[in-house]
Amino acid sequence: MMNILLPLLGGFIITAAFMPALIRYFRARHEGQMIREEGPTWHEKKSGTPTMGGLLFIVAIAVMTLLTSWVLAPHHMLPTTWILIFILVLYGALGMWDDSIKLFHRQNEGLKAWQKMLGQIVGALILFWVYTHEQLPMALHVPGIGNWHMSGWYAVFVILWLVGFSNAVNLSDGLDGLVSGLASIAFAAYGIVAWQQAQINIAIFCFAVVGSLLGFLIFNHKPAKIFMGDTGSLALGGALAAVSILLHHELSLLWIGLIFVIETASVILQVASFKLTGKRIFLMSPIHHHFEMKGWSEWRIDLTFWGIGLVTALSGVWVILAK
């Protein structure tokens, strides 16, 4: 039980204790988020809010994962522990580079798409290398059917999974607290699965994420005092995809992370519809902005999406463990 409580509480305490200092630092330097012009007009009042808060919870996650593994479970300090931290840090570094361009060069576009994708692919290939080195199955687990052996094609899947979900979480990060809550729920679900399946190193990592995000949520709920930025959202998305792969429950993420899937699908459908017919399906995409345009408050959207995320996470865990 301490393997769960230590990273959970430690991550929470580190993030909650040091986040005020990070907020003061960014405010003193007058560095804050630029709000994209195509978003809701009332989001303009958020302009100048400190960003890159993900930097602190990435540090908290890494510290508590390594500390807990070293103190309580040194025999669980496996290559999979290191690759999860590596993916978290690499994708976070990509996001931080992107955020830095927006902050210091006052360009709201950030990195070019190909630059971001190249870094994401490199991280995915390194994850695949560790996966094969650990002699994990080169097969995709399909619920209700069994394992679909993919051989070398599994590398393609790993790339698509990490790139896809890191961008999906990034797209979802458009409301105060939304991704912090959704990611906490999803990582808690996989932490329970990992614990029950005796993959303690992955459970430690997952609960370090949960604790750190809950500490961050204190400052990120509406009205947000700081945003996680691409630094946080890309890191969380990449790590979440990596966890589902290492647990060999890859496709479960489509259900446990259903809101992320819906957010991404809404953007794809919106763009496709406008290109093909000249008409938009939603008032604005991603879909959380559609509900804003319908008059929903940010808190109402957050609570609704968190509720859906909790239901899909609990039911997903039940299905996995029922086997």
UniProtKB/Swiss-Prot annotation:
It is an enzyme of class 2 (transferase). One of its GO terms (biological process) is regulation of cell shape. GO terms for cellular component: plasma membrane. It is a multi-pass membrane protein. It is found in: Cell membrane. The chain crosses the membrane at residues 3-23, 52-72, 77-97, 121-141, 145-165, 175-195, 200-220, 226-248, 301-321. Its cofactor is Mg(2+). Catalyzes the initial step of the lipid cycle reactions in the biosynthesis of the cell wall peptidoglycan: transfers peptidoglycan precursor phospho-MurNAc-pentapeptide from UDP-MurNAc-pentapeptide onto the lipid carrier undecaprenyl phosphate, yielding undecaprenyl-pyrophosphoryl-MurNAc-pentapeptide, known as lipid I. This is Phospho-N-acetylmuramoyl-pentapeptide-transferase. It comes from Levilactobacillus brevis (strain ATCC 367 / BCRC 12310 / CIP 105137 / JCM 1170 / LMG 11437 / NCIMB 947 / NCTC 947).
